[in-house]
Each structure stands twice: as structure tokens, then as C-alpha cells.
Amino acid sequence: KIDGSGVDFKFGAIVRPFEDSPFRIGVSVHTPTFYNLKIKTNVRAVTYTPDFDSKKLSEAVVDSYDFTNGVDYGYDFRFRTPWKYNLSLGYTYGSSFAIGAEYEYQDYSAMHFSYSDGEAMGWQNPTAKEMLKGVNTFRIGAEWKVIPQFAFRLGYNYMSAAFKKTAFKDLSYNSINTDTDFANAKANNNYTLGIGYRGSTFYADLAYMYSTYKEDFYPFDDGALKKTDVTNSRSKVMMTLGLRF
């Protein structure tokens, strides 16, 4: 269990470079989120040993409480997310058509872990740099109002992979995790199609989203082990209904 809180700041601006044109340029910078967190965990190991004389199983229980004076094992730490940079372009034609595009960059290898006294963690930070990389995100969308109350929408979103090809699950010798499998997700593509209605008191939106991405699956870490290619696809339909008073 992890509890805590964090704070970040966002700065941005929108510029219209041409006075008589609806074309606009937007830029924004999101600072890292600075988290102060506390982790609590406990472990229980139960072992059954056959007793052939009594034909029964003897049970042995080892509980982490036995080593931590009856309390959860835990510690305080700090976590800092990467900076995020965004550039957007937008254009409207009259009151019936609008199109916009965005580019976003965030380097996940720059995330940082430290103890409550500020000392950098010696395992988590090098592992993040070794396994993760910068992510490029592109978004583009358009809306066409057939009539003032009814609109068609179309969108596309591309997000590059956050994991390097050589990434693996680096379980420490004292890890409480029992799962060894892992999958390195590749680029993600999202396609959306929607319609919307805006009345004086009632509004409705209906959207369909199709997402697909590939990943390399490994049951455990072994340099000689061949990957399994997996393709993930998902379809989603979303509807919003509302009333204005």
C-alpha cells in the first residue's frame, strides 16, 4: 500500500500570430510532480511438510511481523516525475469546422526516486535510466458542424513506446513479488469517431474508439529466451447524455 500526495505546476500560452486569422499556436510546460509517499507492506510464507509417520502435513508459518515487532514494514520516500512539454496548433473555419494538432514529449528515464532525507536511491534510478526512454505523443482531431446543433468528430492519437527493447523485470533478491513474467509495450495507436448534439437544454455525445498496440512478452528474464509477439486491440463505445438548467 502506498499513500501520499504531490504537487506540480503548469504554465502555458496561446498566441495568434496573424491578427485577422483564426490560426493559433499554443505552448505549455508541466513541471515534474513532486510526491512525498509512504509504502507499507507485509509478507506471510506458509510451508507444508509431509509427516509420513502420522500421514499428515505439518504447517510452518513465517510472517514478516515476526521480524518487524508486529507492525507493517514500510518507509517514506520521494518520487519526481519527468518534465512534460507540449506544442499545439489550431485552426477554425467560420463556425462550422475546427482542426487541431498537438505534440507532447516526456522523458520517463528522467524520473527520480529518493529517500525522505533526500538521498538518491541507488537501484531504482539507474534501473529507470536503463529500461525507460522518452515518449513522443501526437494528437490530431477535427470537428465539422453539419448544422449548429449537430457535429461529426474524428481523431487520431499516437504514443511511442516508453520501454527500451532491452528492458526486463529486474526483481531484487529480496523482492516480495512472485510473478516473473513481463511485457514490453510498443507504440500505441488510437482512432476515434464521434457525433454530438447540442440543444438548448439537452446534449448528447457518442464516440467509438479503437486502440491497438504490440508488445514483447517474456515469462521470465533470460537472455536466451525468445520473445512472444502479442497484439492487443480494444474497442470502446462511450455515450454522454446531459441536461442544462
What are these regions (language model features)?
Residues 1-245:
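Outer-membrane beta-barrel porins/channels
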